[in-house]
Amino acid sequence: MTDTTERLPRALPPGTSPPERIEIDEFVLRRYAPDDDEQLHEAIAESYAEIHQWMPWCVDPVKIEDRRDFIERAALDWATGAAFNYGIFAADLRQIGAVSLMDRIGPGGLEIGYWLRTDATGHGVMTRAVTRLTELGLGLPGITRIEIHCDEANLRSAAVPERLGYRLDRVEDDQAQAPGDSGRTMCWITP
């Protein structure tokens, strides 16, 4: 999928952001802190085989320096309103995934992106996290739609918006960026 961050106007007014911490049942979505680098690294390293198939940023070797760089960029993105990146943490404080609310699809819309640690899949964690971020996103000023973009071959990722009642708005030809990509991006949109 082409990054349109620089070409499209922001959807959110300056200074607008969702909460930094969101509690959901037995887990919490929390804005990244600088000392989350080791947990983030561990979650990605342990789930590399699955995440690498769909996320072009997940490369071998998995390096902690890349996680530190991401957390620094995430802090800047939060401050500018470009993206709101959350770690998903279980009750035992272990990171089990990540979810982001991104202001990169133009006026009126935000995009949600996500990944989940392999051993945390199949328990409804991502469905509940995306449900809550969808509700929060639609409650922000000027936001009328939320989109989820994923490769057509990534059936597990596509199952989340489908379960939540998003509708498949379009499928776009795109350049494959990760090993599992088909080169076709599904764009799901809130009804």
Question: Where would I find each of the regions flagged by the language model?
Answer:
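Short loop/turn motifs at secondary-structure junctions and domain boundaries
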Residues: 76-81
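Conserved GNAT-fold acetyl-CoA-binding loop/helix
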Residues: 52-72
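Acyl-donor (CoA/ACP) binding surface of acyl/acetyltransferases
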Residues: 1-39, 43-50, 85-191
